């Protein structure tokens, strides 16, 4: 990363957690940062990409990116709670949506330093994220729709998306099953993530996140259901 101009200034400690169920995460510890890796991830082909990904999160935090400002996220969620009365599950999935935005931004660094083999592995990784059948629960389906948009936008942003791939057909099946309104919202979500920029000022970033969250929340509160799931 440093050779590409993305220098992490603080010391970084790597550790393994045998009880961790996710692949890994990064956290601040005083003047240092720690990347915690699950034991099972040590054998994964994605290990190198995972470490790069977590280092990129640390870089964005050191840089002071609004996407990695926890207080800003709390401000947006607090405003939504006051206006809309968010439920716990809605809040959880909106935080997931914010994580998708964080990830697509930091992955600009990751994709820039990956080799060809790592890129192919990552394409398959994102393909496995795509859901093809809605659950019938609008809250969960809005979260799945956003995750599909993130996976597709991640590849389109780096010119790696294949329009005739199984991933593409699975996503189309999912979106069309939710109906015409969801198709329009999906297009907006995918475009928002594909074209998101890390250098917006605070006011611009707050406005963009506000619209992003409000659109997802509207989908969560939609009464639409699949006919065969009613």
Residue ranges and their predicted role:
Residues 118-230:
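Pan-zinc metallopeptidase signature
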Residues 1-30, 42-44, 92-94, 217, ...:
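Auxiliary, metal-adjacent structural segments of Zn-dependent hydrolase domains
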Residues 31-35, 84-86:
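Glycine-rich, often proline-containing surface loops adjacent to acidic residues and nearby aromatics
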Residues 92-94, 101, 105-133:
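Short helix/loop segments within enzyme catalytic domains
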Residues 50, 54-58, 62:
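Catalytic glutamate of the conserved HExxH
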Residues 35-51:
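Short pre-active-site segment immediately N-terminal to the catalytic Zn-binding motif
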Residues 45, 60-95:
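Post-HEXXH active-site segment of zinc metalloproteases
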Residues 46, 61-70, 109-122:
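Short, solvent-exposed secondary-structure capping/transition elements
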């Amino acid at each position: 990363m440093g050779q590409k101009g993305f220098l992490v200034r603080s010391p970084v400690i790597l550790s393994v957690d045998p009880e961790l169920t996710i692949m890994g995460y990064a956290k601040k510890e005083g003047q240092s940062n720690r990347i915690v890796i699950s034991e099972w991830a040590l054998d994964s082909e994605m290990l190198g990409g995972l470490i790069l990904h977590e280092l990129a999160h640390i870089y964005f935090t050191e840089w002071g990116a609004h996407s990695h400002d926890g207080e800003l996220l709390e401000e947006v969620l607090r405003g939504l709670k006051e206006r809309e009365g968010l439920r716990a599950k809605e809040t959880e999935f909106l935080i997931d949506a914010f994580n998708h935005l964080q990830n697509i931004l930091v992955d600009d660094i990751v994709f820039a330093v990956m080799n060809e083999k790592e890129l192919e592995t990552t394409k398959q990784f994102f393909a496995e994220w795509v859901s093809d059948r809605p659950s019938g629960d609008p809250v969960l389906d809005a979260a799945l729709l956003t995750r599909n948009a993130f996976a597709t936008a991640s590849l389109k942003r780096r010119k790696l998306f294949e329009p005739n791939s199984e991933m593409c057909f699975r996503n189309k099946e999912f979106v069309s099953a939710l109906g015409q309104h969801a198709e329009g919202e999906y297009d907006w979500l995918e475009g928002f993530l594909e074209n998101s920029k890390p250098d917006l000022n605070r006011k611009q970033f707050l406005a963009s996140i506000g619209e992003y969250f409000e659109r997802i929340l509207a989908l969560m509160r939609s009464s639409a259901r699949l006919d065969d799931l009613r």
